[in-house]
Design a protein with these regions (language model features):
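Generic transmembrane alpha-helix signature in multi-pass membrane proteins
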Residues: 49-59, 106, 117-125, 131-141
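Final/C-terminal transmembrane alpha-helix of multipass membrane proteins
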Residues: 184-205
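Cytoplasmic-side transmembrane-helix entry/capping segments in multi-pass membrane proteins
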Residues: 66-75, 91-98, 114-126
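Residue-level signature of the transmembrane alpha-helical core
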Residues: 35, 39, 73-74, 100, ...
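Interfacial helix-loop-helix junctions of multi-pass membrane proteins
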Residues: 24-31, 86-94, 133-152, 201-214
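A small-residue-rich subset of transmembrane alpha-helices
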Residues: 56-92, 142-172, 184
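Histidine-/acidic- and/or cysteine-rich, low-complexity loops and terminal segments associated
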Residues: 1-43, 47, 199-214
Length: 214
């Protein structure tokens, strides 16, 4: 329990330190630039990072810990492609909801069937892809095909590694042998808690906007 609490605290503390773009804001011009940017991008926002952690834990108990996260990665890549570089107002609220949903499912303590897990990963992953696509265009500007391919490869590789790696930590280091084990459920609760906080922020912002405040 102490190890889990310490790890969660370190993850929260480390997030700002990790939030530095590999290219220091320089424009992407080559495949390598896109690859580096893709590797660094999930670390720019703790909301994306926490969702990937939840994917890793949920996938762990489907019996397909290595391959189930690919559904999320495929949907995320589709979201990046579909975004067309546009920013959609509904994306950030849906990302908050995605954390609440997937974190809640993990905290529930029951293993998801493979079809349900894949549907959740894909359905929610699209919104993360739309967010990545919008930020890619907004921060990096127009990107060539080679840059975009490199970006998607880097983005997918690092997120797969994070998801699978965290799943291994939960099972092998924290000793979670089932979806109902405390480390797994607490991991889900942590993610759901972040989602709930973000949902409250979204609701607060909407309320202030409706009242003409701020």
């Amino acid at each position: 329990m102490n190890r889990l609490t310490t790890a969660a605290a370190l993850a929260l503390v480390a997030t700002p330190a990790l939030a530095h773009h590999p290219l220091a804001g320089a424009p992407m011009e080559t495949f390598a630039h896109g690859l580096l940017s893709g590797v660094g991008h999930p670390l720019l926002g703790f909301d994306h990072l926490f969702f990937v952690l939840a994917v890793g834990v949920a996938a762990l108990f489907t019996g397909r810990a290595l391959t189930a996260p690919l559904a999320f990665l495929a949907a995320m890549a589709a979201g990046v492609a579909l975004s067309g570089g546009a920013a959609f107002g509904f994306v950030e609220p849906m990302i908050a909801v995605s954390l609440l949903i997937l974190g809640g499912l993990v905290a529930w303590g029951r293993a998801l069937s493979l079809p349900v897990a894949l549907a959740a990963f894909a359905g929610l992953g699209v919104f993360h892809g739309l967010a990545f696509g919008g930020s890619l265009a907004g921060v990096e500007g127009a990107a060539s095909g080679a840059v975009l391919i490199g970006y998607l490869i880097g983005l997918a590789a690092i997120q797969w590694a994070i998801a699978v790696g965290f799943g291994m930590v939960v099972s092998r280091i924290w000793g979670a042998s089932s979806a109902g084990a405390a480390p797994a459920r607490l991991s889900g609760a942590m993610v759901a808690g972040v989602g709930a906080f973000l949902c409250l922020e979204v609701a607060e912002g909407a309320a202030f906007a409706a009242l003409g405040i701020g």
